[in-house]
């Protein structure tokens, strides 16, 4: 039935269900996904989860997962599991899920036809689902040893930067504390350009520190302190976000990272990657490019990188027919 091409399967965020079924060799087809139908129709109008859609189109408040899981045994939320939810409560939750999905499908399907969006949904959004399922299932291979080596290197360099900051500051303080850094720069050293937040704390955002370091009237030691502080921040961020965090996402059975791609999270049609986000691995810095070397192909294969250059602006230039913008692209600017 699940693979019968003569029977349409309707669901909400079917990518999740398809991934589970794929592990058991089942290929769900054909399908309609109410989340993607809503996204094709109302891409910039808020969330496309079932709770949001049920409220928006049906005026209905769905049973929340928190409510149903509360029926499971265990004193703390961390101790509770859906497997422990009584059958009658689980059945009510699942039945509502199916009922709401079908009612949403009838509303959204009619809108797709009325608003001439069937082609966009069927040829762009829906066709991408099985592709994304295969991508998530396959994952990407990551070399633990590369991440471990980079983590150690970054830690050593960060420690050196820390010592330099202490020397230039004339005292030790918590480099990870924006409050202590702000007090050092603007209270102790009396540097210009300081701004305070509503809570009365000095701002120490990276762009503010960049502007401060670019001040030609700044004493050289103060400039070096700020620049070294920014380098320390960069390295500690790379360690905590990538070299130390990514190994925890490597699946013990596959040895690969299986990120989750959302097809309905952006207003521009781009995918969003979470758990972990593999779309924001740095590339403009030397350290970022080193982190990228940890992502490797299986033996006998190669990784290929392909990207459109300024695709959104190019589409805008074409659709809006802006001569100056089109000329800028023609001139390679």
Please provide the spans of the model-predicted regions.
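Conserved RNase H-like, two-metal-ion catalytic cores of nucleic-acid enzymes
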Residues: 1-57, 139, 155, 284, ...
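Solvent-exposed alpha-helices and their adjacent loops that cap or buttress functional pockets
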Residues: 2, 295-296
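Structural motif
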Residues: 8, 302-303
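Conserved "right-hand" nucleotidyltransferase catalytic core of DNA-directed polymerases
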Residues: 14, 27-29, 45, 53, ...
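Short C-terminal domain-edge/linker segments immediately following a structured domain
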Residues: 39-43, 61-62, 290-293, 333
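Short, contiguous acidic/charged loop-to-helix segments that flank catalytic cores in large enzymes
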Residues: 41, 249, 325-329
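Metal-dependent catalytic core segments for phosphate chemistry
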Residues: 51, 305, 312-333
């Amino acid at each position: 039935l699940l693979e019968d091409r003569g029977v349409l399967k309707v669901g909400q965020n079917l990518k999740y269900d398809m991934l589970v079924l794929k592990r058991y060799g089942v290929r769900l087809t054909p399908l309609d996904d109410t989340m993607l139908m809503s996204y094709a129709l109302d891409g910039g109008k808020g969330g496309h989860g079932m709770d949001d859609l049920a409220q928006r189109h049906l005026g209905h408040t769905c049973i929340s997962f928190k409510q149903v899981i509360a029926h499971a045994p265990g004193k703390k939320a961390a101790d509770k599991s859906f497997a422990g939810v009584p059958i009658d409560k689980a059945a009510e939750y699942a039945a509502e899920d199916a009922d709401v999905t079908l009612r949403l499908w009838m509303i959204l399907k009619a809108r797709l036809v009325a608003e001439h969006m069937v082609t966009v949904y069927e040829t762009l959004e829906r066709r991408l689902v099985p592709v994304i399922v295969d991508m998530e299932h396959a994952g990407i291979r990551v070399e633990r040893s590369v991440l471990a080596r980079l983590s150690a290197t970054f830690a050593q360099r960060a420690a050196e930067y820390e010592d330099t900051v202490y020397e230039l500051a004339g005292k030790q303080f918590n480099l990870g504390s924006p409050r202590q850094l702000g007090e050092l720069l603007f209270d102790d050293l009396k540097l210009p350009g300081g701004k305070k937040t509503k809570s009365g704390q000095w701002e120490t955002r990276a762009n503010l520190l960049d502007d401060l370091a670019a001040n030609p009237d700044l004493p050289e030691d103060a400039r070096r302190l700020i620049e070294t502080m920014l380098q320390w921040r960069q390295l500690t961020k790379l360690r905590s976000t990538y070299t130390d965090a990514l190994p925890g996402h490597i699946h013990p059975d596959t040895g690969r990272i299986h990120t989750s791609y959302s097809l309905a999270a952006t207003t521009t049609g781009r995918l969003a990657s979470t758990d972990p986000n593999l779309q924001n691995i740095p590339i403009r810095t030397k350290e970022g490019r080193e982190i990228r070397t940890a992502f490797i192909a299986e033996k006998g294969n190669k990784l290929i990188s392909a990207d459109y250059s300024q695709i959104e602006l190019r589409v805008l230039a074409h659709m809006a027919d802006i001569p100056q913008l089109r000329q800028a692209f023609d001139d390679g600017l």
